[in-house]
């Protein structure tokens, strides 16, 4: 079990738990983790998937991009547990629950 946590942004302190996959976005109908108050987040912005013991972060062709370590995420990249990343203008991280 993993925990997706908002570190800074309009929903600071909000968390979502997930086991295999979670979609991040601004639209409640399309996203498991809804960042509806961040207007820089696309309706369906990014996805986190558990692949064995690794986490994969995928930008879903969002308008304003996803950043990891200051770099734009292109396609599917590994996400270390605890490493912060940015979706729109919201800072997030994944930890083990």
Descriptions of predicted regions:
Residues 1-6, 12-13, 53, 88-97:
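Regulatory inter-domain linker segments that are low-complexity and enriched
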Residues 14-90:
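Forkhead-associated
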């Amino acid at each position: 079990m993993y925990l997706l946590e908002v570190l800074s942004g309009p929903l600071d302190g909000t968390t979502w738990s997930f086991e295999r996959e979670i979609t991040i976005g601004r639209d409640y109908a399309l996203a498991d983790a809804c960042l509806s108050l961040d207007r820089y987040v696309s309706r369906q912005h990014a996805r986190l998937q558990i692949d064995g013991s690794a986490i994969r972060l995928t930008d879903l062709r969002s308008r304003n991009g996803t950043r990891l370590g200051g770099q734009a995420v292109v396609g599917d990249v590994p996400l270390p547990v605890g490493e912060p990343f940015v979706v729109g203008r919201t800072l997030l991280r994944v930890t083990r629950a």
